[in-house]
Amino acid sequence: MALNGPGVYHRTREHEQEDASDITKNILAESWKSWPNEAAFDRLEEHRGPLRLTLKGTIPSWAAGSLYRTGPGQSRVEDTARGTHFTTHWFDGFAQTHRFDIIPSEDGETQVWYSSRRQADEWIADVKKKGWRSGMTFGQKADPCVGIFAKVMTVFEPKLGNHNVALLANVPGVPKDEETEVSNGVPGPLGHRVNTSNLFVSTDYTGIRRIDPSTLQPLAETTQYDLHPSLSGPCSCSHAQRDPDSGDLFNFNLAFGRVPTYRIFRVDTASGETEVLATISDLNVPPAYMHSFFLTENHVVICIPASHYAWRGLKTQWEGNIIDSMKPFDKERKCKWLVVDRRHGKGLVATFSTPAAFFFHSINAFEKNIEDEDGTEQTDLFFDLAKYNNMDIIKGFYYDVLMDRDDATKKYWFKNDRYKNCAPTLTRYRFRLPSAPTPDTTFSASAEQVLAIPSPHAGELPTIHPLRNGKPYRYVYSASLRGLTTSVDALVKTDLDTSEAFIWTGPEGHTPGEPVFVPRPGAEAEDDGIVFSLVVDGVNEKAYILCLNGKTMEELGRAEADFAIGQGFHGIHLPAA
């Protein structure tokens, strides 16, 4: 099959059907059995370091700074009161944050230093004491030995943090008394510092955990309630959106109840003040699990996918985890979109629907002003996302499935032909904004699908040029799959104008993570920069930071560790101070 070997492949729209079909062929051939990936998920260690990595090739000196990554670390806790505790879902792996310092030296050779720190020691200590995990989780399977009374009572315990999803830098509006807790003046190797006022780790809960940018030490937690007293709901979005020009931060807060309530808000970078842009409380606007949303030049846009919570959200309190609190997928349950004005105080200005689907990650959104046939100026909104046909992917991230324990991969994905729904499609919708605000909660309007690029020509964990957020753009970088392993197995640059794809593939057993695009200072071309990705070598149980040319996806260099590093979720590159 055309893409099964290592290399860089240039593919066009004409190859889409062939390459998508090869995913199915690889899955049916059970190719994952010859792709070891346990090193990306299990028995991961903390290395406070800093440790110097071995550089092969080159990393441009202009990329000086720190690449931070976060995600699940260890997945088991030994020697608890009830034996070994096993985490069942990858999203519940105990948080660990990593820092790769990229430091040019006087002799011209770039050095890369690595350190990491666990972020959930308090929760791990609680598990050791009790022998089981209390508090809210994403998908931890219930312990049959734990009584229903103990299960329910954990809802009322103080929340134990497991912030393991995304990183936010220079967050405005956080309580000033926390500033004294951050060293950020403690230099790393060779006096290295990064240019940031603060650094936080987020999850799909309203709290974000502050960490020391230099030592990675976990510090105080800030909740959305600290930003504004009306933001009291328990759920939010890991991926806050940021205006690339002003730096203003946007997110939403979801409160459960008889009528669930969404509050979409902005934190002003200049003043630190938080403004609630819209409050939406309507029985036709269901509570749902959402991991990301959209930002355009003038609007915040929420897409509520088919992942609705049961009992108007209150089932989360009964189940104690997100997966078991969601209603089963229903193809009649359309995605509902909320368009909120972010410039002029108009609140909810439009709603529309698209066919039932699920997504973790928005990619980007933007606006275009056009003249219709009558010469009237209209505004079209465009939304790009990594869309799944249904919600099967969520349970595909149980550790048993990812590491193929007891043939779990085949048992899960082959049942009811679920494998047909394992790969996302880059999907673009277009919606014409009404000339006057139309906050119709019947969602009678609809958007048009205008672009669809299937895997492996596009993928998951998408990133773009950071200054193109909310604006027209051309390129997206993502981690894609060819069906050779239980997660992703390739990196891809997708041209949205031509549907061309440049696909990087490593040797067998080399599992890449999210690509992080770093633009070259002063560059004009959107793809003039480099792409970093953490790659886990499952054969030798080691890892390396891969550096690719942003234009060609050819390797420039890599910094190798002689131990495994968790594949993780998301990262951020911060320039040197």
UniProtKB/Swiss-Prot annotation:
It holds the Pfam family RPE65. GO terms for biological process: carotene catabolic process; carotenoid biosynthetic process. It comes from the Eukaryota. Its main location: cytoplasm. Binds 1 Fe(2+) ion per subunit. Its EC number is 1.13.11.59. GO terms for cellular component: cytosol. Keywords: Carotenoid biosynthesis, Cytoplasm, Dioxygenase, Iron, Metal-binding, Oxidoreductase. Pathway: Carotenoid biosynthesis. Induction: The expression is subject to photoinduction and is transcriptionally co-regulated with the genes of the other carotenoid biosynthetic enzymes. Torulene dioxygenase; part of pathway that mediates the biosynthesis of neurosporaxanthin, a carboxylic apocarotenoid acting as an essential protective pigments and leading to orange pigmentation. CarT mediates the cleavage of torulene into beta-apo-4'-carotenal, the aldehyde corresponding to the acidic neurosporaxanthin. Is also active on other monocyclic synthetic substrates such as beta-apo-8'-carotenal and beta-apo-10'-carotenal to produce beta-apo-14'-carotenal and retinal(beta-apo-15'-carotenal), respectively. This is Torulene dioxygenase. It comes from Gibberella fujikuroi (strain CBS 195.34 / IMI 58289 / NRRL A-6831).
